[in-house]
Amino acid sequence: MGKIRVRNNNAASDAEVRNTVFKFNKDFGQHILKNPLVAQGIVDKADLKQSDTVLEVGPGTGNLTVRMLEKARKVIAVEMDPRMAAEITKRVQGTPKEKKLQVVLGDVIKTDLPYFDVCVSNTPYQISSPLVFKLLQQRPAPRAAILMFQREFALRLVARPGDPLYCRLSANVQMWAHVKHIMKVGKNNFRPPPLVESSVVRIEPKNPPPPLAFEEWDGLLRIVFLRKNKTIGACFKTSSIIEMVENNYRTWCSQNERMVEEDFDVKSLIDGVLQQCNLQDARASKCGQTEFLSLLHAFHQVGVHFA
Protein backbone atom coordinates (compact mmCIF):
# COMPACT_ATOMS: atom_id res chain seq x y z
CA MET A 1 0.00 0.00 0.00
CA GLY A 2 1.36 3.43 -0.90
CA LYS A 3 2.03 6.21 1.56
CA ILE A 4 -1.14 7.93 2.71
CA ARG A 5 -1.37 11.41 4.17
CA VAL A 6 -3.39 11.76 7.34
CA ARG A 7 -5.03 14.98 8.46
CA ASN A 8 -3.79 16.37 11.75
CA ASN A 9 -7.19 16.48 13.43
CA ASN A 10 -7.64 12.76 12.80
CA ALA A 11 -4.20 12.01 14.20
CA ALA A 12 -5.12 13.86 17.36
CA SER A 13 -8.35 11.91 17.63
CA ASP A 14 -6.47 8.64 17.25
CA ALA A 15 -4.04 9.64 19.99
CA GLU A 16 -6.99 10.33 22.27
CA VAL A 17 -8.46 6.89 21.64
CA ARG A 18 -5.13 5.14 22.17
CA ASN A 19 -5.15 6.55 25.69
CA THR A 20 -8.64 5.25 26.38
CA VAL A 21 -8.62 2.11 28.53
CA PHE A 22 -11.05 -0.66 27.60
CA LYS A 23 -11.19 -4.27 28.63
CA PHE A 24 -11.94 -5.76 25.23
CA ASN A 25 -14.73 -8.30 24.93
CA LYS A 26 -13.57 -11.46 23.13
CA ASP A 27 -17.18 -12.55 22.60
CA PHE A 28 -17.64 -9.50 20.34
CA GLY A 29 -14.38 -10.15 18.46
CA GLN A 30 -13.09 -6.71 19.40
CA HIS A 31 -9.83 -5.75 17.71
CA ILE A 32 -9.60 -1.97 17.32
CA LEU A 33 -7.86 -0.72 14.18
CA LYS A 34 -5.20 1.62 15.61
CA ASN A 35 -3.08 2.50 12.55
CA PRO A 36 -4.31 5.85 11.13
CA LEU A 37 -2.69 5.15 7.76
CA VAL A 38 -4.67 1.94 7.34
CA ALA A 39 -7.88 3.58 8.55
CA GLN A 40 -7.48 6.40 6.04
CA GLY A 41 -6.64 3.91 3.29
CA ILE A 42 -9.86 1.98 3.91
CA VAL A 43 -11.96 5.14 3.81
CA ASP A 44 -10.23 6.26 0.60
CA LYS A 45 -10.99 2.88 -1.01
CA ALA A 46 -14.68 3.36 -0.19
CA ASP A 47 -14.87 6.26 -2.70
CA LEU A 48 -17.50 8.02 -0.61
CA LYS A 49 -19.66 10.80 -2.04
CA GLN A 50 -21.00 13.79 -0.14
CA SER A 51 -24.53 12.46 -0.65
CA ASP A 52 -23.78 8.96 0.72
CA THR A 53 -25.30 7.26 3.72
CA VAL A 54 -22.75 4.82 5.11
CA LEU A 55 -23.48 1.74 7.21
CA GLU A 56 -20.58 0.94 9.52
CA VAL A 57 -20.60 -2.43 11.28
CA GLY A 58 -18.56 -2.69 14.46
CA PRO A 59 -17.24 0.89 14.66
CA GLY A 60 -15.39 0.27 17.91
CA THR A 61 -13.99 3.56 19.16
CA GLY A 62 -14.63 5.31 15.85
CA ASN A 63 -11.28 5.54 14.08
CA LEU A 64 -12.96 4.82 10.74
CA THR A 65 -16.15 6.63 11.68
CA VAL A 66 -14.68 10.09 12.20
CA ARG A 67 -12.98 9.93 8.80
CA MET A 68 -16.16 8.85 7.02
CA LEU A 69 -18.14 11.62 8.70
CA GLU A 70 -15.88 14.10 6.92
CA LYS A 71 -16.82 12.70 3.51
CA ALA A 72 -20.37 11.33 3.73
CA ARG A 73 -23.77 12.86 4.41
CA LYS A 74 -24.49 10.39 7.23
CA VAL A 75 -22.95 7.40 9.01
CA ILE A 76 -25.13 4.76 10.67
CA ALA A 77 -22.86 2.89 13.09
CA VAL A 78 -24.16 -0.46 14.39
CA GLU A 79 -22.37 -1.51 17.59
CA MET A 80 -23.12 -4.28 20.12
CA ASP A 81 -20.98 -2.97 23.00
CA PRO A 82 -22.61 -0.07 24.90
CA ARG A 83 -19.18 1.18 26.00
CA MET A 84 -18.00 1.51 22.41
CA ALA A 85 -21.27 3.15 21.40
CA ALA A 86 -20.78 5.69 24.19
CA GLU A 87 -17.16 6.32 23.18
CA ILE A 88 -17.95 6.97 19.53
CA THR A 89 -20.80 9.29 20.53
CA LYS A 90 -18.48 11.20 22.86
CA ARG A 91 -15.85 11.63 20.13
CA VAL A 92 -18.15 13.72 17.95
CA GLN A 93 -20.17 15.42 20.69
CA GLY A 94 -20.28 19.18 20.25
CA THR A 95 -18.84 19.04 16.72
CA PRO A 96 -20.50 19.39 13.29
CA LYS A 97 -20.09 15.62 12.90
CA GLU A 98 -22.54 14.93 15.73
CA LYS A 99 -25.62 15.56 13.58
CA LYS A 100 -24.31 13.26 10.84
CA LEU A 101 -23.85 10.24 13.12
CA GLN A 102 -26.54 7.74 14.09
CA VAL A 103 -25.46 5.02 16.53
CA VAL A 104 -27.55 1.84 16.61
CA LEU A 105 -26.94 -0.45 19.58
CA GLY A 106 -27.53 -4.08 18.65
CA ASP A 107 -26.62 -7.12 16.57
CA VAL A 108 -26.37 -6.15 12.90
CA ILE A 109 -27.33 -9.67 11.78
CA LYS A 110 -30.63 -9.44 13.67
CA THR A 111 -31.29 -5.79 12.82
CA ASP A 112 -33.54 -4.58 10.01
CA LEU A 113 -31.19 -2.31 8.11
CA PRO A 114 -32.26 1.06 6.72
CA TYR A 115 -31.28 2.22 3.25
CA PHE A 116 -27.55 2.90 2.79
CA ASP A 117 -25.23 3.48 -0.15
CA VAL A 118 -21.99 1.94 1.12
CA CYS A 119 -21.07 -0.42 3.96
CA VAL A 120 -17.68 -0.18 5.68
CA SER A 121 -16.69 -2.63 8.38
CA ASN A 122 -13.78 -3.83 10.45
CA THR A 123 -15.80 -7.02 10.70
CA PRO A 124 -15.91 -9.13 13.87
CA TYR A 125 -14.62 -12.40 12.45
CA GLN A 126 -17.43 -14.54 13.91
CA ILE A 127 -20.06 -12.76 11.78
CA SER A 128 -18.06 -12.65 8.52
CA SER A 129 -20.22 -15.02 6.47
CA PRO A 130 -23.63 -13.94 7.89
CA LEU A 131 -22.74 -10.29 7.26
CA VAL A 132 -21.73 -10.90 3.65
CA PHE A 133 -24.97 -12.69 2.83
CA LYS A 134 -27.10 -10.17 4.71
CA LEU A 135 -25.55 -7.39 2.64
CA LEU A 136 -26.02 -9.31 -0.62
CA GLN A 137 -29.72 -9.78 0.14
CA GLN A 138 -30.24 -6.10 1.08
CA ARG A 139 -32.74 -4.31 -1.17
CA PRO A 140 -32.18 -1.89 -2.65
CA ALA A 141 -28.64 -3.15 -2.98
CA PRO A 142 -25.81 -0.93 -1.72
CA ARG A 143 -23.30 0.40 -4.23
CA ALA A 144 -20.38 -1.28 -2.51
CA ALA A 145 -19.11 -2.80 0.73
CA ILE A 146 -15.54 -2.34 1.96
CA LEU A 147 -15.00 -5.09 4.52
CA MET A 148 -12.08 -6.21 6.67
CA PHE A 149 -11.88 -9.96 7.23
CA GLN A 150 -9.53 -12.65 8.41
CA ARG A 151 -7.06 -13.13 5.55
CA GLU A 152 -8.10 -16.69 4.66
CA PHE A 153 -11.81 -15.78 4.60
CA ALA A 154 -11.06 -12.83 2.31
CA LEU A 155 -9.05 -15.04 -0.04
CA ARG A 156 -11.92 -17.53 -0.19
CA LEU A 157 -14.22 -14.73 -1.32
CA VAL A 158 -12.01 -13.95 -4.34
CA ALA A 159 -10.87 -17.52 -5.15
CA ARG A 160 -11.57 -18.78 -8.66
CA PRO A 161 -12.38 -22.33 -9.89
CA GLY A 162 -9.26 -24.45 -9.54
CA ASP A 163 -7.76 -22.34 -6.74
CA PRO A 164 -7.01 -24.27 -3.52
CA LEU A 165 -9.32 -22.00 -1.48
CA TYR A 166 -12.22 -22.05 -3.98
CA CYS A 167 -15.32 -23.26 -2.14
CA ARG A 168 -19.09 -22.86 -1.81
CA LEU A 169 -18.57 -19.40 -0.32
CA SER A 170 -16.58 -18.33 -3.40
CA ALA A 171 -19.16 -19.60 -5.89
CA ASN A 172 -22.07 -18.22 -3.89
CA VAL A 173 -20.78 -14.70 -3.38
CA GLN A 174 -19.44 -14.35 -6.92
CA MET A 175 -22.88 -15.15 -8.35
CA TRP A 176 -24.34 -12.10 -6.62
CA ALA A 177 -21.42 -9.67 -6.57
CA HIS A 178 -18.09 -8.60 -8.02
CA VAL A 179 -15.38 -9.14 -5.39
CA LYS A 180 -11.88 -7.69 -5.29
CA HIS A 181 -9.03 -7.98 -2.77
CA ILE A 182 -7.73 -4.46 -2.15
CA MET A 183 -5.46 -4.44 0.89
CA LYS A 184 -3.52 -6.66 3.30
CA VAL A 185 -3.51 -5.59 6.95
CA GLY A 186 -1.01 -7.05 9.43
CA LYS A 187 -2.16 -8.07 12.89
CA ASN A 188 0.03 -5.45 14.60
CA ASN A 189 -2.26 -2.74 13.22
CA PHE A 190 -4.90 -3.75 15.81
CA ARG A 191 -5.29 -3.45 19.56
CA PRO A 192 -5.26 -6.11 20.88
CA PRO A 193 -3.57 -7.92 17.96
CA PRO A 194 -5.64 -10.83 16.56
CA LEU A 195 -4.05 -14.23 16.08
CA VAL A 196 -4.26 -14.02 12.28
CA GLU A 197 -3.56 -11.57 9.47
CA SER A 198 -6.38 -9.60 7.86
CA SER A 199 -7.37 -8.36 4.42
CA VAL A 200 -9.80 -5.80 3.03
CA VAL A 201 -12.09 -6.67 0.13
CA ARG A 202 -14.45 -4.60 -1.99
CA ILE A 203 -17.80 -6.23 -2.76
CA GLU A 204 -20.03 -4.65 -5.41
CA PRO A 205 -23.48 -6.30 -5.62
CA LYS A 206 -24.60 -6.96 -9.19
CA ASN A 207 -27.29 -4.50 -10.21
CA PRO A 208 -29.72 -5.75 -11.29
CA PRO A 209 -29.20 -9.00 -9.36
CA PRO A 210 -29.29 -12.32 -11.27
CA PRO A 211 -32.86 -13.51 -12.01
CA LEU A 212 -32.42 -16.43 -9.65
CA ALA A 213 -33.69 -17.40 -6.21
CA PHE A 214 -30.85 -17.35 -3.70
CA GLU A 215 -32.25 -20.41 -1.91
CA GLU A 216 -32.22 -22.46 -5.14
CA TRP A 217 -28.63 -21.53 -5.99
CA ASP A 218 -27.41 -22.08 -2.44
CA GLY A 219 -29.29 -25.37 -2.19
CA LEU A 220 -27.54 -26.79 -5.25
CA LEU A 221 -24.12 -25.55 -4.12
CA ARG A 222 -24.56 -27.19 -0.72
CA ILE A 223 -24.86 -30.54 -2.50
CA VAL A 224 -22.05 -30.26 -5.04
CA PHE A 225 -19.64 -28.83 -2.46
CA LEU A 226 -20.35 -31.56 0.10
CA ARG A 227 -16.90 -32.85 -0.84
CA LYS A 228 -15.60 -30.34 -3.33
CA ASN A 229 -12.94 -32.70 -4.74
CA LYS A 230 -15.35 -35.60 -5.23
CA THR A 231 -17.22 -35.85 -8.50
CA ILE A 232 -20.62 -34.19 -8.68
CA GLY A 233 -22.03 -37.59 -9.59
CA ALA A 234 -20.70 -39.02 -6.32
CA CYS A 235 -22.22 -36.16 -4.33
CA PHE A 236 -25.65 -36.99 -5.75
CA LYS A 237 -25.26 -40.66 -4.79
CA THR A 238 -25.37 -39.82 -1.07
CA SER A 239 -28.48 -41.45 0.40
CA SER A 240 -29.67 -38.29 2.17
CA ILE A 241 -29.34 -36.29 -1.07
CA ILE A 242 -31.23 -38.91 -3.08
CA GLU A 243 -34.03 -38.84 -0.50
CA MET A 244 -34.15 -35.03 -0.55
CA VAL A 245 -34.28 -34.88 -4.36
CA GLU A 246 -37.11 -37.42 -4.46
CA ASN A 247 -39.10 -35.59 -1.77
CA ASN A 248 -38.65 -32.28 -3.58
CA TYR A 249 -39.70 -33.83 -6.89
CA ARG A 250 -42.84 -35.36 -5.38
CA THR A 251 -43.69 -32.02 -3.75
CA TRP A 252 -43.32 -30.26 -7.10
CA CYS A 253 -45.54 -32.85 -8.80
CA SER A 254 -48.20 -32.43 -6.12
CA GLN A 255 -48.13 -28.63 -6.42
CA ASN A 256 -48.43 -28.84 -10.20
CA GLU A 257 -51.09 -31.60 -10.22
CA ARG A 258 -48.84 -34.08 -11.95
CA MET A 259 -48.91 -37.80 -11.30
CA VAL A 260 -45.72 -39.54 -10.22
CA GLU A 261 -45.15 -42.58 -12.41
CA GLU A 262 -45.44 -45.94 -10.63
CA ASP A 263 -42.02 -46.98 -11.88
CA PHE A 264 -40.42 -43.63 -11.03
CA ASP A 265 -36.73 -44.00 -10.19
CA VAL A 266 -35.11 -40.89 -8.74
CA LYS A 267 -31.60 -42.25 -9.33
CA SER A 268 -32.30 -42.52 -13.05
CA LEU A 269 -33.69 -38.98 -13.04
CA ILE A 270 -30.53 -37.64 -11.40
CA ASP A 271 -28.23 -39.62 -13.70
CA GLY A 272 -30.09 -38.31 -16.74
CA VAL A 273 -29.65 -34.69 -15.68
CA LEU A 274 -25.95 -35.14 -14.92
CA GLN A 275 -25.35 -36.85 -18.27
CA GLN A 276 -27.29 -34.15 -20.11
CA CYS A 277 -24.96 -31.52 -18.60
CA ASN A 278 -21.90 -33.75 -18.92
CA LEU A 279 -21.08 -33.06 -15.28
CA GLN A 280 -21.25 -36.50 -13.68
CA ASP A 281 -17.44 -36.72 -13.56
CA ALA A 282 -16.81 -33.02 -12.94
CA ARG A 283 -15.68 -31.68 -9.57
CA ALA A 284 -17.19 -28.61 -7.95
CA SER A 285 -13.71 -27.31 -7.16
CA LYS A 286 -13.12 -26.90 -10.91
CA CYS A 287 -16.57 -25.65 -11.95
CA GLY A 288 -17.80 -22.08 -12.29
CA GLN A 289 -21.10 -20.26 -12.66
CA THR A 290 -21.75 -21.52 -16.20
CA GLU A 291 -21.62 -25.17 -15.17
CA PHE A 292 -23.64 -24.71 -12.00
CA LEU A 293 -26.32 -22.66 -13.77
CA SER A 294 -26.57 -25.28 -16.49
CA LEU A 295 -27.05 -27.99 -13.87
CA LEU A 296 -29.63 -26.01 -11.91
CA HIS A 297 -31.62 -25.24 -15.08
CA ALA A 298 -31.57 -28.91 -16.11
CA PHE A 299 -32.90 -30.02 -12.72
CA HIS A 300 -35.63 -27.38 -12.87
CA GLN A 301 -36.64 -28.65 -16.32
CA VAL A 302 -37.46 -32.08 -14.86
CA GLY A 303 -39.19 -30.70 -11.75
CA VAL A 304 -36.39 -30.88 -9.18
CA HIS A 305 -35.88 -27.83 -6.97
CA PHE A 306 -33.53 -27.23 -4.06
CA ALA A 307 -35.13 -24.51 -1.92
Curated annotation (Swiss-Prot):
| Alphabetized GO MF terms | 18S rRNA (adenine(1779)-N(6)/adenine(1780)-N(6))-dimethyltransferase activity; RNA binding; rRNA (adenine-N6,N6-)-dimethyltransferase activity
Pfam family, any one: RrnaAD
Q: Which PANTHER family match?
A: DIMETHYLADENOSINE TRANSFERASE, DIMETHYLADENOSINE TRANSFERASE-RELATED
Family from the record: Belongs to the class I-like SAM-binding methyltransferase superfamily. rRNA adenine N(6)-methyltransferase family.
PROSITE patterns (alphabetical): RRNA_A_DIMETH, SAM_RNA_A_N6_MT
Q: Tell me which residues bind S-adenosyl-L-methionine.
A: 31, 33, 58, 79, 107, 122
Which CDD domains does the entry mention?
Answer: AdoMet_MTases (cd02440)
Among NCBIfam families, the record links this protein to: ksgA
Record flagged with keyword Manganese? no
Gene Ontology terms describing biological process: maturation of SSU-rRNA from tricistronic rRNA transcript (SSU-rRNA, 5.8S rRNA, LSU-rRNA); rRNA methylation
Q: What is this protein called?
A: Dimethyladenosine transferase
Q: According to its UniProt record, which reaction does this protein catalyse? A: adenosine(1779)/adenosine(1780) in 18S rRNA + 4 S-adenosyl-L-methionine = N(6)-dimethyladenosine(1779)/N(6)-dimethyladenosine(1780) in 18S rRNA + 4 S-adenosyl-L-homocysteine + 4 H(+)
Q: Name one GO cellular component term.
A: nucleolus
Q: Which InterPro entries match?
A: KsgA/Erm, rRNA_Ade_Mease_Trfase_CS, rRNA_Ade_methylase_Trfase_N, rRNA_adenine_dimethylase, SAM-dependent_MTases_sf
Identify the enzyme class.
transferase
